[in-house]
Amino acid sequence: MVSNLPSILVPMVGIVLPAIVMALLFVYIETDEIA
């Protein structure tokens, strides 16, 4: 089970991490335009 962890973790990090970065960047740009 532990040997299968990286095969699940890598795609999750590859999808979740950019999604969080894009969300933070979007919020930063939106608040910057409002302010």
From Swiss-Prot:
CC terms in the record's Gene Ontology section: cyanelle thylakoid membrane; photosystem I
GO biological process: photosynthesis
Keywords: Cyanelle, Membrane, Photosynthesis, Photosystem I, Plastid, Thylakoid, Transmembrane, Transmembrane helix
Membrane topology, from the record: Single-pass membrane protein
Transmembrane stretches, start-end: 8-28
Cellular localization per UniProt: Plastid, Cyanelle thylakoid membrane
Pfam families cross-referenced by the UniProt entry: PSI_8 (PF00796)
Main subcellular localisation: plastid
Keyword Hydrolase: no
Record-linked HAMAP family: PSI_PsaI
Family to which the UniProt record says this protein belongs: Belongs to the PsaI family.
Function field: May help in the organization of the PsaL subunit.
Protein name: Photosystem I reaction center subunit VIII
Organism: Cyanophora paradoxa
This protein's encoding gene: psaI
